[in-house]
Regions:
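Ser/Thr-rich, low-complexity intrinsically disordered segments
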Residues: 208-223, 227-232
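Long, solvent-exposed, polar/charged low-complexity segments
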Residues: 1-46, 138-208
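Beta-strand residues in well-ordered beta-sheet regions across diverse protein folds
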Residues: 90, 99-101, 167
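A generic structural motif
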Residues: 95, 104-108, 170-176
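A residue-level signal for beta-strand positions that form part of recognition/binding surfaces
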Residues: 71, 129, 163
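Charge-rich, low-complexity N-terminal segments
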Residues: 1-86, 90-97
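Compact, glycine/acidic-enriched structural inserts
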Residues: 97-145
Length: 232
């Protein structure tokens, strides 16, 4: 996907109004393009009847400070995405991140974390360039290979405001950000795990069975995670 110098330059613009104008001009077209592409791909791979929703961050609650990062989320429902695990393309002054995100205390967060913790060794199958972002409000990240995944997800399951994003990052000027469109290589950044890794499809069925009285559950929102098992 193409995020060039102009895309990163939005973070050089001072002030909320000026930066938002730059974000709308430079980034929203990219977010809509790549967000729809990912949504269509996931829907096709999982044979979902309903399309995945694409939510471009509007930052409407901001009244003074310019956003230091911005993003598009793929998943959730018509009203939003934060209460569901979702895919996300995010950009800040240092990198573009393509991740699976579980932030802002989504539905079944503790169950997901407990399942991930019990299968922590499966993360060893991921390639060396995977990262963990433990706070979506900060730019810092850790190489996933250096993280105690079992301990980390045990903490997520027990701490109310714990969160995580797992995926890959690409710096300005990198080959990954110079591609025209979402290529095969970039798709592997979004849907990267092999069939040997975490079998979320089993967990999905368990969640839905255990929570069948919760009318907010949409199978597509959880099935979206299952695509990570695919080696596309």
């Amino acid at each position: 996907m193409t995020f060039d110098a102009a895309a990163f330059s939005v973070f050089d613009v001072d002030g909320l109004d000026g930066r938002m104008e730059a974000i709308r001009a430079q980034l929203w077209p990219l977010f809509n393009k790549y967000g729809r592409s990912i949504a269509e791909h996931v829907q096709l791979r999982l044979e979902l009847e309903q399309p995945l929703f694409v939510h471009v961050a509007k930052h409407l609650r901001r009244t003074a400070y310019a956003p230091e990062s911005t993003w598009v989320a793929i998943g959730g429902d018509k009203r939003g995405y934060k209460k569901y695990p979702h895919f996300q393309i995010a950009i800040n002054a240092q990198y573009v991140a393509i991740v699976l995100a579980c932030i802002d205390n989504p539905l079944h967060e503790k169950g997901i974390a407990a399942d991930f913790s019990s299968r922590a060794s499966d993360f060893d199958d991921l390639s060396f360039d995977y990262v963990l972002i433990a706070d979506h409000t900060r730019v810092s990240y850790e190489a996933l290979s250096e993280v105690d995944c079992k301990g980390f997800f045990e903490r997520v399951a027990s701490v109310k405001k714990a969160e995580w994003m797992i995926g890959r990052v690409a710096q300005p000027g990198s080959a990954e950000l110079a591609l025209n469109g979402i290529s095969f290589k970039t798709k592997t950044c979004v849907f990267p795990m092999t069939v040997r890794t975490i079998n979320i499809k089993i967990f999905v069925r368990e969640v839905i069975t255990a929570s069948k009285t919760d009318t907010t559950i949409d199978n597509g929102n959880f099935a979206m995670i299952a695509v990570i098992n695919e080696n596309i």
